[in-house]
Amino acid sequence: IHVYPEHRDHDPERGDLIPANTPYMLISQGSSGSDQAHLEALAMILAAFRPDTKQRLRETGLIAPTVQMIYRRARVGVRSRAAYLSGGAHPTAFRASDIALARMVGLANSIGPGDIPPLVQLQVLEETQAVEGHDDFGEGLSERLFDTPSAIARIWRSRVGRRSMVVTAADTVDPNGRDLRFDWVLLRGDPDRVRIEPVTEDGRYARIEMDWQGPMPSPGAPDILSHRIDIGVFANNGVHDSAPAFVSVLLPHHEARTYETGADGVPRAVTTGGQATGGTYADPLLFPADPDGTR
């Protein structure tokens, strides 16, 4: 697990500039040195595992996912399963003041080798395919930021007002052969403009439909605007929930766009192009400048 300070990438002045959420690292709120408390917490969790559990974690390659679950599940304010399955438990950047070492150590020590949660593995089966030139986005640019087993990220470059995805967690296997049930949860974004529909009874497949939307306050940090939709996927083996897997979509709110909802309920672009007012920052690696200097 890597730990990095956010250093001006997650602040009230410019908002949340991180393009995607992942369970592979922790981002600390603050600048250099803000990572130290989180590193200590991770070390304490590792030290608290029972020897037989730690051996089983090594054998299954599940040390990091289990540590991630414990760190997130035992933070200040995450006292229930409902709280864990919410955006507040999975922020972009973590505050040191939310670390609860005693709870983290206690949870780590309570996990037996037969109760280890699985690693959620995702795959996109279908998704809206924008047509370059027709849907107006940059030449040679893809809307796919990355696809990894536990994190999928997209950039909403096209002018389409609604996009959908069918995602599966069917490759997820419990290390001890337990039956699994899945929860798909909107962690951030406008709940009136995101719809998640499990396709199967156990939740291994889900259809996600998203409408264009404006920035929203970040969960747990309302003074920081977020330009991202995050959906968390959790597997429960009857004892513990897994660490989250994420589907993230970054919206380019530095662009001036206007959408209107048609009679069929689908948003359609009225105006696109140009810079939004307020000087919203855009990462030049994700949004290269056009020859006229605009993005």
Model-derived regions, located:
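Extended, non-transmembrane interaction/recognition domains
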Residues: 1-145, 149
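Structural beta-strand segments of beta-rich domains
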Residues: 118, 163-167
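Low-complexity "stalk/linker" and mucin-like segments enriched in Ser/Thr/Pro/Ala/Gly
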Residues: 122, 133-134, 142-157, 177, ...
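Acidic, Ser/Thr
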Residues: 168-176
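Short beta-strand elements bearing conserved aromatic residues within extracellular beta-rich modules
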Residues: 182-184
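Exposed beta-strand face motif in extracellular beta-rich ectodomains
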Residues: 225-231
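Conserved structural position at the C-terminal beta-strand
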Residues: 235-237
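Extended alpha-helical scaffolding regions
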Residues: 240-295
